Design a protein with these regions (language model features):
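N-terminal secretory signal peptides and thylakoid transit peptides that target proteins
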Residues: 1-15
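An extracytoplasmic/periplasmic, membrane-proximal ligand-sensing/linker region
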Residues: 27-52, 224-226, 230-289
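Bilobed "Venus flytrap"/periplasmic-binding protein-like clamshell domains
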Residues: 35-59, 70, 93, 117-183, ...
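Short helices/loops that flank or line small-molecule/ion binding pockets
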Residues: 74-88, 101-102, 135, 179-199
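Acidic, polar ligand-binding/catalytic clefts
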Residues: 78-136
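A ligand-binding cleft/hinge motif common to bilobed small-molecule-binding domains
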Residues: 92-102, 161-162, 187, 192-212
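Short beta-strand->loop
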Residues: 105-115, 171-172, 205-223
Length: 289
């Protein structure tokens, strides 16, 4: 079972602090909209990059907006489950987990990149290390991100399984939490190989947070449905429509850059059945995660 954890919340006025319980008498039409973003990079960086989104939504929705970054994926699932946030930007698999525990959650948007609503996981290795191809991973440590991450755990682990490599049997599973932690650890030679979102990897290279000369690409996963934007099903219809419209009509590249996409399209729960199928390949019981 997922344990309740504290998570970080950040806003311009309050900074980082502990998140309290339900804050509004009217859950269906709260005075303030709390939006959670995944902790797939440093929280302070995410908060800083989210300020244009905050300003845009406050202008469109005519409500104060609080940007929240949880300490991990499980904390975000719990926050959505217990009504501590109204909108959540989940990873594909963390959304599937959240939906299994709170069926009223509604996906309403998905990022579009290069004309497609999907992305890939990239498997990388230390450039001068022992891993040159997938087969070389056998008998060695392999770094994943958060356990509930799609591109930094579920998808690459399923890819390795299809290649005959089973975690903790054929290689040692190492979880480092965040995508950037995986890239840095592999670049430094602390682990010989690992996996993360290809989109995040590109950003880390472009911003010179990792040196591509120290890394080797060994594989890409099959396309994965992109991160879904979700909201609480109990919100009043007028507010849900306004939230949906605000995101689907987003055109500002400075805001879309936060999501690493060029546009946001409509999404449905059925779009994520491929993740449920992937979990079956790995013999994961979603209800018990």
């Amino acid at each position: 079972m997922i344990q309740r954890r504290d998570f970080l919340l950040a806003s311009v006025s309050t900074g980082l602090c502990a998140l309290a319980g339900p804050a509004f008498a009217d859950k269906a039409n709260p005075d303030k909209l709390r939006i959670a973003l995944l902790p797939d990079e440093n929280a302070a960086t995410i908060i800083q990059n989210a300020q244009p989104l905050k300003a845009y939504l406050e202008g469109v929705l005519k409500k104060p907006v609080e940007i929240i970054v949880t300490t991990d994926y499980s904390s975000m699932i719990e926050a959505m489950r217990f009504g501590r946030i109204e909108v959540g930007y989940f990873g594909p698999f963390s959304y599937v987990l959240a939906k299994s525990k709170a069926t009223e959650i509604e996906p309403f948007g998905v990022g579009v990149e290069k004309g497609k609503p999907n992305y890939q996981s990239i498997l990388i290795a230390t450039a001068d290390g022992p891993v040159k191809e997938i087969a070389d991973i056998k008998g060695k440590p392999f770094a994943f991100g958060d356990r509930a991450s799609t591109s930094s755990h579920l998808a690459p682990r399923a890819l390795l399984a299809k290649k005959g490599l089973i975690g903790d049997a054929d290689y040692k599973v190492v979880h480092l939490g965040q995508h950037d932690a995986v890239a840095r650890a592999v670049a430094a030679g602390q682990v010989p190989a690992g996996a993360l979102s290809e989109a995040i990897y590109r950003v880390l290279v472009e911003t010179k947070k990792v040196d591509p000369a120290k890394l080797r690409q060994i594989a890409l996963s099959d396309p994965i449905p992109n991160y879904p934007l979700t909201m609480q099903g109990y919100l009043k219809p007028e507010l849900k429509d306004a939230i949906r419209k605000a995101f689907l009509e987003l055109k500002d590249p400075a805001i879309l850059k936060l999501f690493r996409v060029e546009a946001i399209a409509a999404a449905t729960d059925k779009d994520y059945d491929v993740l449920r199928d992937m979990a079956k390949v790995l013999q994961l019981d979603i209800a018990k995660l």
